[in-house]
C-alpha cells in the first residue's frame, strides 16, 4: 500500500503552480497543466485549492522579511537592500511568489491588489518608518520611501517581467545599491 502525504502533495502542487504562474502569468496556466507537472489528478487541485483562482492565490502568497534588510546605519541602506534584492532575484528564479504577483497584476485585479498591499506593508511602510526614525521629517521620509519602492518595482518589472537579463549580479547589486542610497539620501 502506498502511503499518502497530503501536505507534501499540496506543497508539490504549489511549487509547480508558482513556477508556471511566474513564467506564464495567470491566463495561460491551466489546472490540468499544473496537475500534470505535479503528477497529480486535477481533482486534487480542486480539493486542496478550490480551483484555479484558489491555486493562484495560494501560489502567490508572499512572505518576505524585507524589514530585516533595513536595520543598521542609513549610510549602508542602499547596499543592504540591494544585496537582499539581488539575492532574491537570483535565488527564487522561476518560483518567486512576488514574481507571480507582478506578472499576474496586469491580468487579475486581485493580483494587483495583493501586490500593492504586499508592497505597502512590507516595503513602503518599513522604509518610511526607518527613514523617519533615522531623523527625517515624516513627509520627507514617506517621499523617499516611495521613490525607493517605485524604483525597485520598476527595475524588477523591467528585468524580471519583461524578461530582460539581470546581467552581472555584482554590477547589478552595485548599481542598485548606489541608486537606492541616493534616493534614501535625497540626492536622486
Stretch-by-stretch model annotation:
Residues 1-43, 50-54, 65:
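Basic, helix-initiating cap at the start of DNA-binding domains
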Residues 53, 89, 106-110, 123, ...:
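Short alpha-helix boundary/capping elements
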Residues 56-63, 70:
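Alpha-helical DNA-contacting segments of helix-turn-helix folds
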Residues 66-99:
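Hydrophobic alpha-helical connector segments
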Residues 79-83, 120, 124, 128, ...:
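An amphipathic alpha-helix signature
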Residues 85, 98-105, 148-152:
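Short alpha-helical scaffolding segments that buttress acidic/His motifs in well-ordered protein cores
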Residues 90-121, 162:
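Amphipathic alpha-helical segments used for helix-helix packing
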Residues 112-117, 131-188:
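Hydrophobic/aromatic-rich alpha-helical bundle segments in the mid-to-C-terminal region
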Amino acid at each position: 500500500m502506498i502511503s499518502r502525504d497530503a501536505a507534501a502533495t499540496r506543497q508539490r502542487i504549489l511549487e509547480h503552480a508558482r513556477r508556471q504562474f511566474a513564467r506564464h502569468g495567470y491566463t495561460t496556466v491551466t489546472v490540468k497543466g499544473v496537475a500534470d507537472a505535479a503528477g497529480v489528478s486535477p481533482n486534487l487541485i480542486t480539493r486542496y485549492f478550490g480551483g484555479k483562482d484558489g491555486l493562484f492565490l495560494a501560489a502567490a502568497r508572499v512572505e518576505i522579511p524585507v524589514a530585516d534588510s533595513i536595520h543598521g546605519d542609513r549610510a549602508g541602506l542602499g547596499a543592504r537592500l540591494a544585496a537582499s534584492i539581488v539575492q532574491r532575484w537570483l535565488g527564487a528564479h522561476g518560483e518567486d511568489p512576488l514574481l507571480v504577483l507582478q506578472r499576474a497584476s496586469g491580468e487579475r485585479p486581485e493580483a494587483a491588489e495583493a501586490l500593492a498591499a504586499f508592497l505597502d506593508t512590507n516595503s513602503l511602510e518599513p522604509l518610511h518608518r526607518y527613514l523617519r526614525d533615522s531623523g527625517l521629517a515624516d513627509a520627507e521620509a514617506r517621499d523617499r520611501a516611495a521613490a525607493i519602492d517605485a524604483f525597485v518595482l520598476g527595475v524588477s518589472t523591467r528585468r524580471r517581467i519583461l524578461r530582460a537579463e539581470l546581467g552581472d549580479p555584482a554590477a547589478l547589486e552595485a548599481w542598485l545599491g548606489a541608486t537606492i542610497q541616493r534616493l534614501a539620501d535625497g540626492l536622486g
